[in-house]
Amino acid sequence: DTATSGRVVVDGRDITRASENDLVEYRRADVGFVFQFYNLVPNLTALENVELAAQICPDSLDARETLEKVGLANRLSNFPAQLSGGEQQRVSIARAVAKNPKLLLCDEPTGALDYVTGKQILQLLQDTCRKDGITVVLITHNAALAPMADRLIRFKSGKVIEMSVNPSPTPISQIEW
């Protein structure tokens, strides 16, 4: 999308004025996406889906290790149709994390996961943010997750209605939903 007003500045660079090719390069190298619908390539294994994304990035993480971090070490050779919805979601998360992006955009990343796995994934995302210095933007309708955030932006009807900073985020282990 093209901005209709204002500016978007990333790492000191105004990407509002960037060419389409520059935006493609920016997204490819610096942004990881976790989609609500997983968008896995059906004829590639879990490992190959993650490797595909990692190949386009200069400082990517090891695909196998990233899949292990999301609890899929024993499902590397499975195709998406052989995985449950939650497993497919974890492949999607691993694919985004393996790019080692500066910005990770996650749309309902725990939506298809059970409670325990959801907490593990939230912990992985928080660790990725804190330890690796990656900015993680978590988009969710689950208000119970808000206390874990460093910053919170609330939307209503497509408009920002509140922005706040959380000086002491709640550990994920203490969040219940």
Predicted stretch roles:
Residues K159-W177:
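Conserved beta-strand-loop-alpha-helix hinge in the C-terminal portion
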